[in-house]
Amino acid sequence: HADLRLAQLDDVLNAHEEAAEGLFRGIRHAGASAGDIQGLAIPGGSDRNLMSNEAFRAGVARLGERGLTYDTWLYHFQINDFMELARALPATTMILDHFGTPLGVGEFAHQKEAIFEQWKEDIECAAACPNVFAKLGGLAMPDNGFGWHERSTPPSSDEFLEAQARYYEHAIACFGVERCMFESNFPVDRLSIGYRVLWNGLKKMTSDFSEEEKDLMFSGVARRVYRIDAK
């Protein structure tokens, strides 16, 4: 992590480079801003105007200049702010984590379908930015409103797909397999779903994809974006 607004950002990035001994690839400076939203298990504490902050934008631009990536976690109502950032800084590779976290608790608990419909439009617009990649996972967090963390037994892979496959399918349709990477979001999602169950569900969901397409989403895109030399 690094606060991308820092005037001494290069000093911090240099320290990361040195400590990582060639394995440093990018920064995740979360943008999730909960404000006064009630009922969140993991409330994001970022500045609501972070994405338009001049110092922050300069920091994100600096990542691109250094060949580093920018990851963000934010809420569904902030995806438009992220799109503006991505359009303004096309030279920086950006990764949208956790589907943009469509919330489903508190004031959003009874708006799931309306939020989903707006989310679909926003994801389609975000995918129009060629420098943006989608990290698909993290929907089992309590704040997404599926309630699995409150059950006595976790969901099966079929239950997982019944509830969440439409999010994955839409994101893949918008971004294409060349810009999607699957994630577990563990240990956070461990509150709601088993690790093997999650990955088995993703394997079931992608059963009709070609081997090449599956390789991209399960590993290839991540290897390319984060420059991982898998030997």
What is each PLM-predicted segment?
Residues 1-2, 28-31, 96-103, 213, ...:
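A generic structural motif
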Residues 185:
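Active-site glycine-centered loops adjacent to acidic/histidine catalytic or metal-binding residues
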Residues 166-181, 189-231:
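Mid-to-C-terminal alpha-helical segments outside catalytic/metal-binding sites
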Residues 1-66, 88, 109-110:
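Mid-domain alpha/beta scaffold segments of enzyme catalytic cores
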Residues 38-41, 107-109, 145-149, 193-195, ...:
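Short aromatic-enriched loop/helix-cap "lid" or pocket-rim segments at secondary-structure transitions
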Residues 5-7, 35-38, 80-82, 102-105, ...:
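Short catalytic/ligand-binding loop motif for oxyanion handling, primarily in non-cytosolic enzymes
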Residues 49-181, 213:
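Catalytic pocket-lining loop regions of alpha/beta-barrel enzymes
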